């Protein structure tokens, strides 16, 4: 399945049904009076954030979204039926912009969050509503109004607990595959990952959502490589998991290059809590690994975790889960109020 994270669509609410002009006609009732009913309201186009969908692929083939029109009123005081709403599921993390992409309209970053993109029109009024003491037989009515109509730009920013970052071929996809049931493509060459992947890891009662994005290279924040398009997908992760390939001749430069690209893209992103892992340690001797670990710790001023292909990952998952919980508590208000995160980490 293709990963689609942007789509421009046209949405239109349903038209309201027209009011009715009608008069009561029954045997032995000479002046029955007006009995035209009102028209029904048009349906609305509503987007709802759902965990059941992961991309905006649906909108590649459905660029025109319309709700149902309301039905017209009829005689005997019958009101027209309201048009059915068009409810469309979108991935959690979907943002709605105006047609030019300059103004943010809505940000659906919580499961179940809804937004009415195009409201339906109001139903027209039948002639029965215009009866008065001075006008016993009104013959006028109103038409239903048109529904709202917009062109909107949808952008997706993935919501995850842990964003896995690093240079190309650092082992990000392999780690995601080992931690989760995600069937990501894994090969020994750069840019194996061409689109973001999500996976859910479980260990000792802990549940963790991880996102793997394409590797970052120099000038990724300016569009080089694949990173520029997908850097936005880790903006909403709670913490960063930075993988550094132990076999590289200059691991400090590799680490600093990725950090620099994060800073150039967003200071907020660069300021997220980071866990550093020295990966592929099975390719070097224990002495070489210890030497590189100390070198990286000295440069980053952070504790560096070493990881080999055969290592069990349950303890790592539990550790990351604890770091995420700690970050959620101390996160600024922009994310700390997120009900999804609250339920996710307080359901135990």
UniProtKB/Swiss-Prot annotation:
Binding site for GTP: 166-173, 191-195, 212-215, 279-282, 310-312
Entry-linked CDD domains: Obg (cd01898)
Main location: cytoplasm
Location(s), subcellular: Cytoplasm
Cofactor (UniProt): Mg(2+)
Gene3D superfamilies xref list: GTP1/OBG domain, P-loop containing nucleotide triphosphate hydrolases
Record: residues binding Mg(2+): 173, 193
PROSITE patterns on file: G_OBG (PS51710), GTP1_OBG (PS00905), OBG (PS51883)
Keywords annotated in UniProt: Cytoplasm, GTP-binding, Hydrolase, Magnesium, Metal-binding, Nucleotide-binding
Top-tier EC class: hydrolase
Similarity comment: family membership: Belongs to the TRAFAC class OBG-HflX-like GTPase superfamily. OBG GTPase family.
Quaternary context: Monomer.
PANTHER family for the chain: DEVELOPMENTALLY REGULATED GTP-BINDING PROTEIN-RELATED, MITOCHONDRIAL RIBOSOME-ASSOCIATED GTPASE 2
Protein name stated in the entry: GTPase Obg 1
């Amino acid at each position: 399945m293709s990963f689609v994270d942007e789509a421009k669509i046209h949405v239109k609410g349903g038209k309201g049904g027209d009011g009715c002009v009608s008069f009561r006609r029954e045997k032995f009732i000479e002046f029955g009076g007006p009995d035209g009913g009102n028209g029904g309201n048009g349906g609305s186009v509503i987007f709802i954030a759902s965990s059941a969908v992961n991309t905006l692929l649906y909108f590649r083939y459905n660029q025109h979204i319309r709700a149902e029109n309301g039905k017209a009123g009829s005689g005997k005081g019958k009101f027209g039926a309201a048009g059915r709403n068009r409810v469309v599921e979108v991935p959690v993390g979907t943002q709605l912009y105006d047609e030019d992409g300059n103004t943010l309209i809505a940000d659906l970053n919580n499961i179940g969050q809804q937004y009415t993109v195009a409201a339906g029109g109001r139903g027209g009024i039948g002639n029965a509503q215009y009866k008065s003491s001075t006008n016993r037989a009104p013959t006028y009515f109103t038409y239903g109004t048109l529904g709202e109509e917009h062109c909107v730009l949808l952008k997706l920013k993935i919501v995850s607990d842990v964003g896995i970052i690093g240079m190309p071929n650092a082992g990000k996809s392999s780690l995601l595959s080992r931690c989760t049931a995600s069937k990501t493509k894994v090969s020994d060459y750069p840019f194996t990952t061409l689109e973001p992947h999500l996976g859910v890891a479980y260990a000792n009662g802990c549940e963790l959502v991880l996102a793997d994005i394409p590797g970052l290279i120099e000038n990724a924040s300016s569009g080089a490589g694949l990173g520029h398009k997908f850097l936005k997908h880790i903006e909403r992760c709670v913490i960063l998991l930075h993988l550094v390939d132990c076999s590289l001749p200059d691991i400090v430069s590799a680490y600093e290059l990725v950090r620099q690209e994060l800073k150039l893209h967003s200071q907020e992103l660069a300021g997220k809590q980071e866990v550093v892992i020295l990966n592929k340690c099975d390719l070097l001797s224990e002495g070489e690994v210890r030497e590189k670990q100390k070198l990286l710790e000295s440069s980053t001023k952070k504790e560096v975790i070493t990881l080999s292909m055969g290592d069990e990952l349950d303890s790592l998952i539990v550790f990351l889960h604890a770091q995420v919980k700690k970050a959620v508590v101390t996160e600024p208000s922009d994310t700390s109020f997120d009900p999804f995160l609250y339920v996710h980490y307080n359901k135990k």
